[in-house]
Amino acid sequence: MRKMFIFEFILAAHVVFCILIEMQSIIFPIQQKLVDLDNVGPVKKNTHANHNSYFDLFGFFGLCIWLLLKYFFEGFRFNSILIMAAYTFFFFDRALQFADKILCQVAAVLTILYIWTLISYPVYEFPKSTGKYRTCYKSIKLNDSYQTDTSVYYPCQDNKQEDIKYKWLPNNKFSKLIYELSILSTKWAPSEWIFDIGLSFLNFINFTASIEQPLINKELDVIIFSHGFSQHRNAYTTLCQQLASEGYVVFSLQHYELVYPWDIKGTKIYNTGNYPEIIEKYQKIRSSHLEWRIEQIQQLIDNLKSNKIKDVFYDFKPLSINLIGHSFGGASVLRVAQEINVNSVIAYDPWLFPFNQEQMHKQVKCRTLILSKDKNRIKQEWFDPKLLKEFLDFNTQIEHYKIKGLDHAYPVDLTYLIAAEMVLIGELRTDENLFKINNLISSLTIKFMQQKLFSIEENKQFS
């Protein structure tokens, strides 16, 4: 279901009205004016200066009011820059008074583009969980050496309680993380304020879960989820809630590595053609970050096994411990699986760049599934498919499937929130199969943990 932003359409209607009034002498050269502002209220005919003042006052204050309302109640998307530019051209046209209204025509084109993006580039509501259990959510801080912030999604008792809304973003730093990632990964990145504006609507994104209730059982299977690079602990809420609705207790950890790790502002780490010494330095930095992640996961496993989370769930006993991770998180859970034995490990398109040579050749100790994309977006040293092939050559027991149409961004919730923008920058090939691919990932994940066979239809999705 599409998420509606009312103030987007109000802004569009406001600027369309202003442009029509301003250009009515061109659009309707013979017919009577749509609105004769020369005779409105106290403004008298032939008082052109007063006419301009009245109209500019109306347009300017209308713009300010609607922009402020949108900012404080909905936030801006990247396409909001189009409507801001349309207003700018419109008021420049008013100030300069070009006879052919050329700037006003530019404003009209920008407004049409803006309306087109509202229709063509939707933001989707997070899909509802389809499992048989109600799901609850709580945010906790683990008593480990990192004081790790953790989101817990769990199946709870159904006492006909209400669902409540929770903020999707755990803090206000996400746009900065995405900006820093863009600096690293692209040849050119816009200014940070562009990201602050274009992603501010994420501050108003919520997900729903039941008000806090007891667990359905004191003995349940546990999943520890490790998020991808530059993401956060709530970034996979749709998947985590689906897993919780199937009867799993999901602990989604917050990792704290830096996105841009040093102060060489001109360094483009991810681009092809970097000097080997820079790539080597970057690999060592990310390798140290990988060790931080491993410590967080291992400490949570130890706490679960020794029942040291009584403040979260009293007298809870995990029936099994399973690890799931995406991208950097995928590498994290694979690395843990090389050191300790858990019930199962699932890695979504793991980013193996931080692995050293010894780790690339070390075997995992448990049942492991890797789901990866069928096609690389661009050639990048940091995501060379040869790394995964080399890892699998030394781990032949791992089940590995390439999924048709899968891009690296799946299964992040951003695929529902900024799918069109991700297509534009090449993170997604298309935004047409979002729900299908995310549902497939969820289904394969659950069946693997339950040791069930994939269906014939699911096997057809493997390349």
Segment roles from a protein language model:
Residues 1-84:
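Extended, compositionally biased non-globular segments that define protein topology
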Residues 113-222, 431, 454:
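Domain-level recognition of soluble alpha/beta enzyme cores
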Residues 168, 173-183, 187, 234-277, ...:
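Active-site machinery of serine-nucleophile hydrolases
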Residues 205-220, 225, 229-262, 377-380:
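Short substrate-entry loop that stabilizes the transition state in hydrolases
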Residues 216-217, 344-410:
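The feature captures the conserved acid-bearing segment of alpha/beta-hydrolase catalytic domains
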Residues 265-315:
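Alpha/beta-hydrolase active-site loop
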Residues 324-329, 333:
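Gly/Ala-rich beta-loop-alpha elbow adjacent to hydrolase catalytic centers
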Residues 389-463:
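C-terminal catalytic-base region of ester-bond hydrolases, centering on the histidine
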